[in-house]
A protein has these predicted regions:
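Bacterial N-terminal signal peptides
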Residues: 9-20
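N-proximal helix/coil linker or "cap" segments that precede and/or mark the start of modular domains
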Residues: 22-39, 57
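Non-globular targeting/processing and membrane-anchoring segments
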Residues: 170-178
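Short pre-active-site segment immediately N-terminal to redox-active cysteine/selenocysteine motifs
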Residues: 59-61, 66-69, 136
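Structural microenvironment flanking redox-active thiols in thiol-disulfide oxidoreductases
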Residues: 74-114, 124-131
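A short beta-strand-turn-helix
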Residues: 40-60
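Thiol/disulfide oxidoreductase modules built on the thioredoxin-like
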Residues: 112-117, 124-166
């Protein structure tokens, strides 16, 4: 009995001391903050090759990994549109349509029915997914004007404005910029 209590106590203490490390590990989503993604060439929806370097390294860039079937991506849309109205003159908004359970034609048809004010790019071979280490759709990476990642996040609860303010060099108190 005493031995079992000692083992349980040791396990609880170990878990207590490991918990912060586990939580920090969970904060790393996709490409680490401070890194620069490798060069990537995608396609526009007309099939033309487009290097991301056309935008990256010139001014802040927000990249969202998106799919027509992603409900969280749809929930992020109003925030993305509001951020574009606020930062559109100081940042580029790129949406990378991933080739998971959708085709380029599906994306094109979706955008004809539901126009969005962003630059859409097609990641048919997963090059951008690999470069940004995107774990899922609704993943967002924000890069500053030097091309370094200043924020990554996934899901509907992202503070896009704070991330863009950090990228643009106008930080303010933010709930969850990473």
């Amino acid at each position: 009995m005493v031995k079992a209590c000692a083992v349980r106590g040791a396990l609880c203490a170990g878990l207590f001391f490991l918990a912060p490390a586990v939580l920090r590990a969970q904060d790393v989503i996709g490409i680490p903050v401070g890194e620069t993604p490798p060069p990537v060439t995608l396609e526009n929806l007309n099939g033309d090759s487009v290097p991301l370097s056309r935008w990256i390294g010139k001014k802040p860039v927000i990249v969202e990994f998106w799919a027509t079937w992603c409900p969280i991506c749809a929930e992020l849309l109003p925030r993305m549109e509001a951020a574009q109205r606020k930062f559109g003159d100081r940042a580029e908004f790129l949406v990378v349509a991933v080739a998971v359970n959708q085709s380029k034609n599906t994306v094109r048809r979706h955008l004809e029915r539901h126009p969005m004010p962003f630059t859409f790019l097609w990641d048919g071979n997963g090059a951008a997914v690999r470069a940004f280490q995107a774990p899922s759709t609704s993943y967002i990476a924000v890069l500053d004007s030097t091309g370094k990642v200043v924020y990554t996040g996934v899901g509907e609860d992202q503070n896009i404005d704070a991330a863009l303010e950090r990228a643009a060099g106008t930080p303010r108190a933010a709930k969850n910029p990473r």
